[in-house]
Amino acid sequence: MQANGMIFWDWNGTLMDDVDFTHSCLNWMLETHGYPQRYDLAAYREIFGFPIEEYYIRAGFNFAKHPYAELAERFMEHYNAGVDACFPSAHAAETLAELSRRGWRQSVLSASRRDYLIEQVAARGLQGYFTELLGLADIYGVSKVQ
């Protein structure tokens, strides 16, 4: 086994298949807060991005009516209540295991709050593949690099 370097993985939507769930969370947030628009998956993918605050603007949230911090907290409450139904992406575990066997060091770089990231990785039994789990100190998703 020869170490070949470091691989940085994304977590949400890459190693963990939560795209359909986060898409449904957006539509739930819009409905809950009285907004008429809903997004199909393709439109969701078009507007999603970082910073999350700008994504919320693209989705149509009015921060004068619903402040971003409150929306972010509400989203995380809803997301955390249902995320256990999300599983690793197809072949993620096998790929991580094979790369580990070949000597690659692997880390996760995520815009998720770090404690949530650690819980989600552990709940899926993948923590042993990573040398580091790099997440944010808060839930506001400004950038993966802070």
How would you label these PLM feature ranges?
Residues 114-146:
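Substrate-recognition "cap/lid" segment bordering the active-site pocket of phosphatases
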Residues 26, 56, 92, 117-121, ...:
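Hydrophobic packing residues within well-ordered alpha-helices of enzyme cores
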Residues 24, 32-61, 65:
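Alpha-helical substrate-recognition element adjacent to the catalytic core
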Residues 80-108, 114-118:
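Short, acidic loop-to-helix structural element flanking the phosphoryl-transfer center
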Residues 1-43:
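Active-site neighborhood of HAD-like aspartate-dependent phosphohydrolases
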Residues 22, 52, 88, 141-145:
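Conserved donor sugar-nucleotide recognition element shared by glycan-biosynthetic enzymes
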Residues 57-94:
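Metal-dependent phosphoesterase signature
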Residues 23, 49, 53, 93, ...:
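Alpha-helix N-cap/helix-start and coil->helix boundary motif
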